[in-house]
């Protein structure tokens, strides 16, 4: 069974890495797991923190719990150094794969994997995942349409993992619904045979409580706070919860 403290196979860089270092411990202390931290230019600057329960689920209340816990910490540490939107979200159906348990849970489904270190001159792979090795060192992937004479299944070294995420397919959507994950959002295609999501289905959400303001600037001459107010971006119309469709369209895809 996956544990909250299971280490990730990937890490962020730059500002995202500083945010991850600050929030990972508090998130684990709440019984959740940090998945990824992403910084984007949406609405000026958006800090997106993906989190989940060890079983892979995450609902509105859980997102709000995480947001309330880490917001004061981020305000104190100020890793961004400017105004930004804090967005807490679940990983989504086409989720990133960042732990060995993620690969175990989604064995048999299509994924895109990019290695940080080339393997036989190649870094990017797309195929059906197998079950990781017992020691968690490698994960097999079945490659479609390989050239004659080349192996159709190879073992990818997880120590060299750069990025990985599931590919959004009808089979994946059906299985996500069966496991109690969120239904697809507006703009996502679903096979009609998959059926509609139950009314009590936990929605795939983002929780955006409010824009975060930068710390007041100090007057170098007087060593006093500047009287000039610092403006933060206005929040989106419609409240703090928005759908995930936009993120699916804007996600950096692996080829």
UniProtKB/Swiss-Prot annotation:
Main location per the UniProt record: cytoplasm
Entry's Gene Ontology cellular component terms: cytosol
CDD domains in UniProt: YlxS_C
Compositional bias ranges of the Basic and acidic residues kind: 216-230
Keyword Cytoplasm: yes
UniProt cross-references to Pfam families, sorted A to Z: DUF150_C, RimP_N
One GO term (biological process): translation
Region spans: Disordered: 177-255
Record-annotated membrane-spanning stretches: none
Record keyword Cytoplasm present: yes
Subcellular location: Cytoplasm
Keywords of this entry: Cytoplasm, Ribosome biogenesis
Biased composition (Acidic residues): 186-202
HAMAP family assigned: RimP
Biological function: Required for maturation of 30S ribosomal subunits.
PANTHER family according to UniProt: RIBOSOME MATURATION FACTOR RIMP (PTHR33867:SF1)
Family, as annotated: Belongs to the RimP family.
Name of this chain's protein: Ribosome maturation factor RimP
UniProt organism field: Methylorubrum populi (strain ATCC BAA-705 / NCIMB 13946 / BJ001)
């Amino acid at each position: 069974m996956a544990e909250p403290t299971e280490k990730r196979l990937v890490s962020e860089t730059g500002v995202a890495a500083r945010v991850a270092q600050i929030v990972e411990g508090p998130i684990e202390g709440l019984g959740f797991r940090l998945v990824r931290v992403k910084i984007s230019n949406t609405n000026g600057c958006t800090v997106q923190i993906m989190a989940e329960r060890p079983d892979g689920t995450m609902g509105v209340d859980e997102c709000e719990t995480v947001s309330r816990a880490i917001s004061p910490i981020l305000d104190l540490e100020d890793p961004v150094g400017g105004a930004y939107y804090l967005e807490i979200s679940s990983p989504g159906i086409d989720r990133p794969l960042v732990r060995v348990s993620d690969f175990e849970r989604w064995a048999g489904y299509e994924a895109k994997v990019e290695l940080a270190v080339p393997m036989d001159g190649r870094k990017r792979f797309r195929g059906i995942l197998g079950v990781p090795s017992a020691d968690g060192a490698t994960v097999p992937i079945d490659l479609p349409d390989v050239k004659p004479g080349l192996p159709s299944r190879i073992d990818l070294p997880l120590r060299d993992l750069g990025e990985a995420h599931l590919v959004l397919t009808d089979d994946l959507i059906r299985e996500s619904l069966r496991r109690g994950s969120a239904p697809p959002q507006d703009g996502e295609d679903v096979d009609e045979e998959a059926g509609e999501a139950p009314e009590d289905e936990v929605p795939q959400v983002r929780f955006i409580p409010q824009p975060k303001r930068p710390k007041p600037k100090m007057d170098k001459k007087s060593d006093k706070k500047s009287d000039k107010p610092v403006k933060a971006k206005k929040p989106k119309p419609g409240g703090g919860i928005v759908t995930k469709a936009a993120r699916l369209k804007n996600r950096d895809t692996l080829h």
